[in-house]
From Swiss-Prot:
Enzyme class per UniProt: oxidoreductase
Applied use: Due to their effectiveness as antifungal agents, echinocandin derivatives can be used for the treatment of human invasive candidiasis.
Residue ranges occupied by any Fe2OG dioxygenase domain in the UniProt entry: 178-294
SUPFAM superfamilies recorded: Clavaminate synthase-like
Taxonomic source organism: Aspergillus rugulosus (Emericella rugulosa)
Lineage of origin: Eukaryota, Fungi, Dikarya, Ascomycota, Pezizomycotina
Keyword list, A-Z: Dioxygenase, Iron, Metal-binding, Oxidoreductase
Example GO biological process: small molecule biosynthetic process
Gene name in the database record: ecdK
EC number of the protein: 1.14.-.-
Identification of the protein by name: 2-oxoglutarate-dependent dioxygenase ecdK
Gene Ontology molecular function: any one: dioxygenase activity
Length: 332
């Protein structure tokens, strides 16, 4: 099982034939593995290096500066800084399935800290920023990266609708007044032995809460996706180019398509090259994840087009905000 690499220019500026071929390849990749890689999306190597530099600069801030914008834990969209181990993904996806139940893995710990923002114009759940003099230019850069990622992911939804032979706005039309989120992840260095003991992971197997995710990762390794041919196994997805994105299906797209497209189960753990090195230490790892999400009051029930006429929908009606609250509530 391998992850397809797609050239975004084939859809963004391609001919009608190229756009349809891109959409079909995207659908094939999502159907087979739940993941694709995306290149030539408009972010340069310099811009990607810059966002990772901001990642480092933010997490290098003194604890008291980060604590001043701490995320208020609970069942709501995350905003600001979450300390090491605050979020517990070991509670998610019992049995590796999309579920609103809480797993009983109450002794599992995450070895990561993260910083989350939503749309700049969000008045309901406002962003929390370091003071401008602390990190001059940080807020502007993050907001710009957010907006460009939003545009890319909306085009991917258009491509998917084209391949699935549904109206162009089937998915995109639910994203006006969106509630997308952007996250910086920092996984501090950690002894290999700590992870091998089985109580701590960089991030446990889980699916993402949104529609699709756009992930940029450094070259340290450790990202693994479920092998759908052998569901108890995971396969590494290493970075091959500094500008590539890993794109995966989230919960809401699985729900909208009535399970036709399945959310991609993934984890971050010890890279294969470091396994069985009990005395070794995993180096610091960084990533940047953009989570495309719909308007908060839009439904995340199965869309009627994907429900056969003689069957009931697999996923019940609830708003995107209610779904987010249920899922976020599980990890705290």
């Amino acid at each position: 099982m391998s992850v397809l690499t797609l050239d975004f220019t084939k859809f963004h500026s391609g001919s009608e034939v190229e756009r349809r071929a891109f959409g079909q390849a995207l659908l094939d990749g999502f159907t087979t593995t739940g993941f694709v890689k995306l290149i030539n999306h408009g972010f340069s190597k310099e811009e990607m290096a810059d966002i990772f530099n901001w990642n480092q600069r933010f997490f290098d801030l003194p604890i008291d500066r980060k604590a001043a914008i701490r995320n208020d834990e609970g069942p709501k969209p995350q905003r600001g800084w979450s300390s090491l181990g605050a979020e517990k993904t070991g509670f998610l996806n019992p049995g590796g399935k999309l579920s609103l139940a809480r797993a009983s893995n109450n002794d599992r710990q995450d070895a990561k800290e993260h910083f989350d923002i939503g749309p700049a114009e969000d008045e309901e759940f406002q962003n929390k920023w370091p003071e401008e003099q602390t990190l001059p230019g940080f807020q502007e850069t993050m907001n710009s990266y957010f907006d460009r990622s939003q545009a890319i992911t909306l085009e991917l939804l258009e491509a998917l609708a084209l391949a699935m032979d549904v109206p162009k706005d089937t998915f995109v039309g639910l994203c006006h007044g969106h509630a997308s989120e952007l996250r910086l992840n920092h996984y501090p260095s950690i002894p290999v032995k700590t992870i091998e003991e089985g109580k701590t992971n960089r991030i446990w197997p889980h699916t993402d809460f949104g529609i699709i995710t756009l992930l940029a990762q450094d070259d340290i390794g450790g990202l693994e996706i479920q092998d759908r041919n052998h569901p108890s196994d995971f396969l590494p997805v290493n970075r091959e180019d500094s500008t590539e994105f890993v794109v995966n299906i989230g919960d809401i797209l699985e729900r909208w398509t009535n399970g036709r497209l399945r959310a991609g189960l993934h984890q971050v753990t010890t890279p294969r090259s470091m396994q069985q090195k009990g005395n070794g230490t995993l180096p610091t790892r960084r990533s940047v994840a953009f989570f495309l999400k719909p308007h908060r009051q839009m439904s995340v029930a199965s869309i009627s087009h994907f429900v056969p006429g003689n069957q009931s929908p697999r996923y019940e009606d609830m708003t995107a905000l209610a779904y987010q609250q249920l899922r976020t509530g599980i990890v705290y």
